[in-house]
Amino acid sequence: MKALSKQESRAGIWMVDTEVPRPGPNDLLIRVKKGSICGTDVHIYKWDEWAQKTIPVPMVVGHEYVGVVAAMGSEVRGFNVGDRVSGEGHVTCGHCRNCRAGRRHLCRNTLGVGVNRPGSFAEYLVLPAFNAFKLPDDIPDDVAAIFDPFGNAVHTALSFDLVGEDVLVTGAGPIGVMAAAVARHVGARNVVITDINDYRLDLARKMGVTRAVNVTKEDLWSVARNELGMTEGFDVGLEMSGSGPAFAQMVDVMNNGGKIALLGIPSGDVRIDWNAVIFKMLTIKGIYGREMFETWYKMAALIQSGLDLRPIITHHFGIDDFQQGFDAMLSGQSGKVILDWEKR
């Protein structure tokens, strides 16, 4: 089969021929239809410090996809050949304290599809059946292909009550924009998103945010106070950028008793005003991945109740043009980029 693999310890991704993997007794063999390029894949492509420490070479990469069940292990129940599926990319151990307590998203022994085990940028993927999510018929393939990052957005956005609240999202990458759209969909009063990339702020506007702010050109607090009538600060903060200055600004503009969910990963140490955290009595919660599988059920329900993610998908390429897809991601002038394994 064809696959995209990190073949060498340098920048780049390579198309290779490799054997079709064999499912174990508890696994599904999934024929991949479409995949999406994640920021993690870009880190691996660029071979940055994190990738060098984390990724064994060679490794088939990718973890955002939609496909159909091609074969099943002998012990698999609840699936049929031909079922349309996506899947949870965090493969957990099942025997640690958190797994046994039903908190699998907190497993200390998690392996990542396309990171520590073979990924979904391939014609076929083997995945534990436990990790597969059977897709409703009314969720289109393009949207299903981005369910993994959508799950990050949903997990982050729904960490706190949003109904009637003023929400600040820092970072207008695809996950940040989707988190902002979730907040609007479930009833937040104002949803403000900040970034320094005008292209992605325009995507956020298309997804329905109340206000998109380029912090190099406008003052965030002036916009909130003078345009939106906010006098006390934001109630909920969703930090999606990994930017130290963005996080510091978020802490500064939160209302007393505000709640912050952190998904963005900083590249180094970040300084914030801990006195503000204490005296404002802020709650800060770290987010990683998706809750298994509560987040997945909520994702499907949000789409089925009318949340439209299609504007965040900006590019489509046949798999033979994968390099163009990575170039689009690297440019910063894209939303989600779809690679189609059925289009050569």
UniProtKB/Swiss-Prot annotation:
Any single GO BP term: L-threonine catabolic process to glycine
Amino-acid positions noted as binding Zn(2+) 1 in the UniProt annotation, renumbered to this chain: 38, 63-64
Cofactor: Zn(2+)
Record's keyword terms, sorted: Cytoplasm, Metal-binding, NAD, Oxidoreductase, Zinc
Localization terms from the record: Cytoplasm
Annotated site, Important for catalytic activity for the proton relay mechanism but does not participate directly in the coordination of zinc atom, chain positions: 148
Catalytic activity: L-threonine + NAD(+) = (2S)-2-amino-3-oxobutanoate + NADH + H(+)
Co-factor note (free text): Binds 2 Zn(2+) ions per subunit.
Enzyme class at the top of the EC tree: oxidoreductase
Single Gene Ontology MF annotation: L-threonine 3-dehydrogenase activity
GO CC term, one of those recorded: cytoplasm
Residues holding NAD(+): 175, 195, 200, 263-265, 287-288
Keyword NAD: yes
Enzyme Commission identifier(s): 1.1.1.103
Family: Belongs to the zinc-containing alcohol dehydrogenase family.
HAMAP family xref list: Thr_dehydrog
Assembly, per entry: Homotetramer.
Function: Catalyzes the NAD(+)-dependent oxidation of L-threonine to 2-amino-3-ketobutyrate.
Protein name: L-threonine 3-dehydrogenase
Species whose genome carries this gene: Deinococcus deserti (strain DSM 17065 / CIP 109153 / LMG 22923 / VCD115)
Gene: tdh
